Amino acid sequence: MGYAAVPPVERGSCSAGANNRDITFDFVKGILIILVVLGHLLQLVIYRNTDNFWLSPYFKAIYMFHMPLFMAISGYLASGTILRTSFCRAVGDRAVQLLIPMLFWCALIETAKLAAFFHFSGVTAGLLDFSRELVGTYWFLWAVLASFLLTKLFAAFNLLSKWILCASAIVIALMPITLSIVPLLRYTYPFFCLGFLFAQTIEEQANTMLRHKSLLMFSCWAVACLCFLDWGRDTYAYNNLVLVHDAQSAKQVLLMFTGSAAAAAVAAQSLFHCWRVLCSTRLARLVAVELGQSTLLLYLVQGAVFRLTDLIQFGELWDGKTRIVVASAIGAAIFGAATAVLWIVNDLGYVSRIIVGAPRRLKRSS
């Protein structure tokens, strides 16, 4: 999610800037980070104080694929680093890129909580609360880092065959560990492997997909639609914990992985097509450059905003229209705040790395 790696050029038809960077994946990431914010707005504002968001078709449509596709893109874009960079440097760079901004924004959350509630329960309790924020609020970044580390370990020992990666994805997905965010890591790791493997066999896959593209996409659409219809509250990894203990739980876990994979494939192909059609328009390039190249910062900002709003009591008596207006305002504020932060710190060297993770490699071309 937060990678600044330059994607390969075979995908897109439009590049940007003097370095001819293909920003196809930036466009896809820009759309996905919008969906991340929309999903949280549905959960924490539109359906606030209820559990009805689990049954929302909009929430379902987003959560079926947005994080799996984000993880697959992370695996795809990280493949070059995993294969060509030394273990210590690759892991160190990725840890610095992700962990330092996480620490900064979690410290900001804790400071805001302390200032708002004027309650300090001691150093030990404060550290425990900080660790919970660090792990829970930004679980996806931990999933990216863990997936990167595990895949890099396989590379370090020359064990990166597709069979070993596929086996590792299955074993990790089925491990009966439900501690903290481990179920979410087990859910997303197979998609990281899928993206990584696709990057290694892009030419072979491209030829196969061109020959059978219509059949493949029809099959993915059909599977995604069927899974959407059968998708329920217990199909989400947050609720089933990716745990198989009987026939019903096995059905839900299988439905979750199958539906997520099919929906992610449909979404990816649809977004690639949108980019090919719209890449010359100002709006599409704004999404790619301003949002897609700032997904790490946007994820950090929205996590902080939603964590703080979750601690405030509001909206009990609001009607639907009021909730939509407030959700729109919060969403706009998130993107506005992230843009302002990036504008302020983008050229400040180490300050930028602490707050943003890494500056964007591409400015908007004139």
Swiss-Prot record:
Family, similarity comment: Belongs to the acyltransferase 3 family.
Annotated TM spans: 27-47, 62-82, 98-118, 140-160, 164-184, 212-232, 253-273, 286-306, 324-344
Principal EC category: transferase
Mode of membrane association: Multi-pass membrane protein
Name of this chain's protein: Nodulation protein NolL
Gene for this chain: nolL
EC number(s) recorded for this UniProt protein: 2.3.1.-
InterPro entries referenced in this protein's UniProt entry, alphabetically: Acyl_transf_3_dom, Nod_factor_acetyltransferase, Nod_factor_Fuc_AcT
Protein species of origin: Sinorhizobium fredii (strain NBRC 101917 / NGR234)
Keywords, ordered alphabetically: Acyltransferase, Cell membrane, Membrane, Nodulation, Plasmid, Transferase, Transmembrane, Transmembrane helix
Record Pfam families: Acyl_transf_3
GO molecular function terms attached to this record: acyltransferase activity, transferring groups other than amino-acyl groups
Gene Ontology cellular component annotations, sorted alphabetically: plasma membrane
Compartment list: Cell membrane
